[in-house]
Amino acid sequence: MRKLFVFILLLLAVAVSAQTDKAFMTVDWGKIKAEVEANPQRVQQLVDILINVDADTTLTAKDKILAVYGRTYLNNGRDLLMEFDMSKARNEGKFDKAAAIADKVLASNPLNTNAIVSKIYNFRILVDKEPDKSWMLSDSLKVYSVRLSRILDTIFMTGDGSKEYPFSVTAVGDEYNLLQFFLGIFKVNGQSVVGTCDRLVLGETNKNYSSPDIYFDVKRVFEIEKSMFNSQGGDGK
């Protein structure tokens, strides 16, 4: 899979280099939730533009943040259980099965980064197995790679990875996908919860990210997981 990592990193290199010495926009969850409740159709329209490989240039940074983070209030984690099954299949090396489940996950939440990665994994394998179809598969691979790039670029806008300004995520998978496919960091030596943040201790650094640890704001992740637990009959305590 290292070849795949290198492939995607090449696609994302321009996005990373363009954000050197960036300014960032922290996520105002209360404001985003209010905007979703007031106009859910607009949020969905922004999502549709974001995932359209030919249309994203019309979106401002604020629009992208509203799309990526507002979408969670439209879906409320309904894709989470399917994502568990998908990740299990992928970890077992059943990439075709994972890709099939990923289609269902993306039908529920088109911004699920783990599902997008599962599709990319499978397309990359098929390109090697079926070279006569590589032109068609490469087009599909590009579509999902661009979508992943846009989502991760939006996450990257929300902080600098410090405890004071953590990157905001809506799923744990976003953390590792940002590390691997956007920052090019593959080694993590440890993880801990610090307040409402996940802190990852890194086993390597590079020119894209030089700090020894990285923080992610997981407030929304906790809310989604609690909501799912309650819907499954838990007491939420």
Predicted regions and their residues:
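Residues in flexible loops and secondary-structure boundaries
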Residues: 4, 9-12, 123, 224-226, ...
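Residue-level detector of intrinsically disordered/flexible regions characterized by low predicted structural confidence
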Residues: 4-5, 141, 191-194
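Long, positively charged binding patches that form subdomain-scale interaction surfaces
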Residues: 136-177
